[in-house]
């Protein structure tokens, strides 16, 4: 794998040439609001047509199927555009290997305190191969169904949104709680878990869902790259983020980020495609607050530093003043933005956590002390918002989603590298200008 070299986008890209008649194609299904919504909003403002996708559905433990007519109608209404109804579920956790139980079936009845239970890896590998074949066939069908929806001469922007891949076995959820929120006796070392068979299964599943899907997309859509049309690919990565901790630009990361190894594979697939002449970029985006953040407490700590980046880039800019005002309105009576930043900095800039701020060796595993310090900082900062369901971090996330969408749309027109970091500096510049 190519060693990581820090390649941040520093300057605002010029306005793109995407416009009316061009098509943005989602490869992955939208559930709730997240980064992809910012790019969709920017594309629609440019006049682009948006075409969506689905991962399909399962009825209980039944086989994967397309959306039913009511599900399909509801999905198209929610997207506000057409959806290609080919089930693109990636991964292999429910995949029967042909002559034995699926990985999830192997784990049926395993208790959380038996997380070191061994798996039959010959069955796991056969299930993985079967899942990969299923996805490749589905992606080819997706590309064939998509082709008539792309007008002749239209430019196309593919947006890879596939991520995740936690195996759907009951044993995992209590383990995830211990891994990401456990302190004291409930702490579970991410390194120890990652070395177990359950951890290895997670790693393989993440790679199939988060990373290999990008390669499958590029391969299946080769036909659309023929001719004079401009075809670009973007994907959402994460590889830490540079923020202002105090007054110092600092690369930092959420720990433990178990999908990190799969995100590295995603970057590698983009580099391989770039060398083959495919214009694509994985954008390593900042941390935001999403529906899943309740499990990953602490991921939002670096987000508060966006306020400091806005102050540095344009302290009196209308966007800076508006965002600060909206954030202040969400504070508890005894909270302040200055207090929020000070408490977040106490974790982000603490000397004892400097080893976790090294790009080299990323992703990093947790320690009991580091996780406890991060969770304590998260709890203290969250308490400064009046409503935990509408926190300051949520407002800053909405700003980041908007800016990242605009940055990705513009940068994708003439991409200059297969991997680009988006730090708070360029996000703040985009919001201000």
PLM regions and their residue ranges:
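Long, compositionally biased intrinsically disordered regions
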Residues: 2, 6, 13-14, 299-433
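Structural motif
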Residues: 22-23, 154-157, 232
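Glycine-rich phosphate-binding loop and adjoining beta1-alpha1-beta2 segment
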Residues: 49, 53-127
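Canonical Rossmann dinucleotide-binding motif of NAD(H)/NADP(H)-dependent dehydrogenases/reductases
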Residues: 3-61
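Catalytic loop of short-chain dehydrogenase/reductase
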Residues: 58-66, 170, 174-277, 282-301, ...
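Short alpha-helical segments and helix-capping/turn motifs at coil-helix boundaries
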Residues: 8-12, 34-39, 138-148, 156, ...
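Short acidic, low-complexity segments enriched in Ser/Thr/Gly/Pro
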Residues: 91-123, 167-200
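A glycine-rich helix->loop->beta "capping" turn
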Residues: 100-160, 165-166
């Amino acid at each position: 794998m190519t060693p990581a070299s820090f390649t941040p986008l520093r300057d605002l890209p010029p306005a793109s040439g995407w416009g009316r008649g061009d098509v943005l194609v989602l490869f992955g299904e939208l559930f709730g609001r997240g980064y992809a919504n910012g790019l969709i909003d920017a594309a629609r403002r440019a006049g682009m047509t948006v075409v969506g996708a689905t991962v399909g559905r399962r009825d209980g433990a039944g086989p994967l199927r397309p959306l039913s007519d009511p599900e399909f109608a509801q999905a198209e209404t929610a997207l506000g555009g057409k959806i290609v109804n080919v089930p693109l579920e990636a991964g292999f956790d429910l995949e029967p290997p042909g002559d034995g139980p699926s990985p999830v079936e192997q784990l049926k009845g395993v208790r959380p305190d038996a997380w070191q239970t061994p798996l039959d890896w010959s069955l796991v590998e056969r299930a993985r191969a079967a899942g990969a074949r299923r996805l490749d066939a589905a992606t080819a069908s997706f590309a064939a169904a998509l082709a008539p929806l792309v007008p002749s001469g239209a430019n196309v922007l593919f947006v890879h949104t596939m991520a995740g891949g936690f195996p759907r076995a009951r044993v995992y959820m209590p383990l995830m709680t211990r891994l990401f929120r456990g302190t004291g006796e409930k702490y579970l070392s991410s390194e120890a878990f990652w070395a177990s068979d359950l951890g290895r299964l997670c790693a393989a599943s993440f790679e199939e869902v988060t990373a290999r899907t990008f390669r499958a997309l590029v391969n299946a859509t080769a036909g659309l790259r023929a001719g004079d049309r401009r075809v670009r690919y973007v994907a959402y990565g994460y590889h830490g983020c540079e923020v202002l901790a105090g007054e110092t630009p600092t690369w930092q990361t959420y720990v433990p980020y178990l999908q990190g190894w799969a995100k590295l594979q995603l970057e590698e697939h983009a580099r391989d495609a770039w060398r083959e002449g495919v214009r694509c970029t994985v954008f390593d985006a900042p941390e935001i607050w999403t529906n899943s953040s309740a499990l990953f407490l602490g991921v939002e700590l670096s987000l508060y530093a966006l306020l400091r980046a806005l102050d540095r880039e344009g302290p009196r800019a209308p966007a800076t003043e508006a965002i600060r005002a909206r954030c202040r309105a969400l504070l508890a009576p005894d909270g302040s933005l200055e207090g929020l930043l000070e408490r977040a900095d106490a974790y982000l800039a603490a000397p004892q956590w400097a080893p976790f701020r090294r790009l080299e060796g990323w992703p990093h595993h947790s320690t009991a002390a580091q996780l406890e310090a991060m969770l304590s900082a998260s709890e203290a900062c969250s308490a400064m918002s009046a409503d935990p369901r509408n926190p300051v971090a949520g407002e800053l996330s909405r700003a980041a989603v908007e800016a990242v969408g605009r940055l990705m749309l513009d940068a994708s027109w003439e991409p200059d590298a297969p991997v680009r970091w988006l730090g708070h500096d360029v996000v703040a510049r985009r919001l201000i200008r």
